[in-house]
Amino acid sequence: MFKAELSDSSILKTSFDAISSIVDEVQIQTDSEGMRLDALDRSHITFVHLELKASLFDEYVCDVPEKINIDTGEFMSVLKRAKSQDRVIMSLDEGNFIITFEGDATRTFKIRLIDIEYDNPTPPELEHPASFKVHFGILKDAINDIDIFSDKIALQVDEDYFRASADGEFGDASVKYLHGENINTQEKSLFSLDKIREMLKADKFSEEAEIGLGTDMPLKLTLNMVTGDGKLSFLLAPRLESDE
């Protein structure tokens, strides 16, 4: 038996708003400790990991481990129907992923499970030379500022500042943020702005983002719930000069 109840749908909505932009299908794995997924987009550019602990849920039961293969777009379409005051209940029944919203009315949706062979991707083990935290709102504003002039963004960090910049045909833009971390190196990488924008759709998961950065290395973006009950993280491959 699997059953998970949440009094607030926002964590699921914000998580799968990002995830559904990156991958079409996922396998959600459940056990007594909670729900999690690992997925890699078709172009092998973005890796995503989601972990929701059993303690996050108002009620959580998973007697035996389950593998739930679903279409992320269909799941997101259902989640968009949740009202702010609705309780969300997830369960399984005869090849269906059941999502029920309980509020002024009880609404039930059945998503057919996908019969696919799913190889769970494993992320590379990376040690980024620089790791630091930034307020999510500052990061999102920086991306929106850069978006004016270019479809790619340079992220760099040194002893004092985290910088985002772009050089476009019609103009340039740059944003810098005093990070306040103990960093003794200078690192810089170039990334697709569209790919970063997909990740930043998870803007309600956490108020703070942890960034791992290294020269010509994948970007690591980690969002941790302040309660410690959930984590959403991404790895984004860099755009090398030879890609231009």
From Swiss-Prot:
Pfam family, one: PCNA_N
InterPro entries in alphabetical order: DNA_clamp_sf, Pr_cel_nuc_antig, Pr_cel_nuc_antig_CS, Pr_cel_nuc_antig_N
GO molecular function, one term: DNA binding
UniProt-listed GO biological process terms: leading strand elongation; regulation of DNA replication
Signal peptide extent: none
Cystines in this chain: none
Stretches that traverse the bilayer: none
SUPFAM superfamilies found in the cross-reference section: DNA clamp (SSF55979)
Entry annotated with the keyword Transcription regulation: no
Alphabetic keyword roster: DNA replication, DNA-binding
PROSITE patterns assigned to the protein according to its UniProt record, in alphabetical order: PCNA_1 (PS01251)
Assigned protein family: Belongs to the PCNA family.
Its biological purpose: Sliding clamp subunit that acts as a moving platform for DNA processing. Responsible for tethering the catalytic subunit of DNA polymerase and other proteins to DNA during high-speed replication.
Assembly and oligomerization: Homotrimer. The subunits circularize to form a toroid; DNA passes through its center. Replication factor C (RFC) is required to load the toroid on the DNA.
PANTHER family membership: PROLIFERATING CELL NUCLEAR ANTIGEN
Protein name from the UniProt record: DNA polymerase sliding clamp
Organism in which the protein naturally occurs: Methanobrevibacter smithii (strain ATCC 35061 / DSM 861 / OCM 144 / PS)
Lineage: Archaea, Methanobacteriati, Methanobacteriota, Methanomada group, Methanobacteria
Gene encoding the protein: pcn
